[in-house]
Amino acid sequence: MNTAKTIDYYNKHAQTFVEGTISVDLGSIYAQFVSRLPDSARILDFGCGSGRDTKYFLSQGYMVDAADGSQELCALASQHAGIPVRHMLFQDLNDVQRYDGIWACSSILHLSRADLKVVLEKMIRALRERGIIYTSFKYGTFE
């Protein structure tokens, strides 16, 4: 997949994307994820999009870092969640043992298979001992 094209798409359609995703109810998935976290967990919302999930985790008392590759989505997510959102590509994750949980909801699916392997390794390095990752992908036979 072409990272520049993907980011350009999200920059051009950020408001429409936010409007289409901000109200999606992920309550049952959130519950499964947070049930495996310590009370004072630090979470990375990796590819935070609208900031919907960041806002939820903050409302539950977690420390949250949010990041996205689209500058436009970073701005909208920051407004919605009320925290600064870091503009970065998935490939630029270099944290080591910083997070108890990494939430990558419908985000890293945009990576090529080769980039996905590298990014998953970086995500694992960014986890503290007993840390967990949530990610979601689309069905398909494409890369």
Question: What would you call each of these model-derived segments?
Answer:
Residues M1-P38, S40-G49, T141:
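Conserved class I S-adenosyl-L-methionine
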Residues S50-D92:
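Class I SAM-dependent methyltransferase SAM/SAH-binding core
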Residues Q91-I102:
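A short acidic, Gly/Pro-enriched loop at the edge of an enzyme's catalytic core
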Residues G101-D115:
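A short SAM/SAH-binding and catalytic strip from SAM-dependent methyltransferases
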Residues K117-E129:
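A short glycine-rich, Lys/Arg-flanked "PGG" loop and its adjoining helix->strand segment in the class I
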Residues R130-F137:
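Conserved beta-strand signature within the Rossmann-like core of class I S-adenosyl-L-methionine
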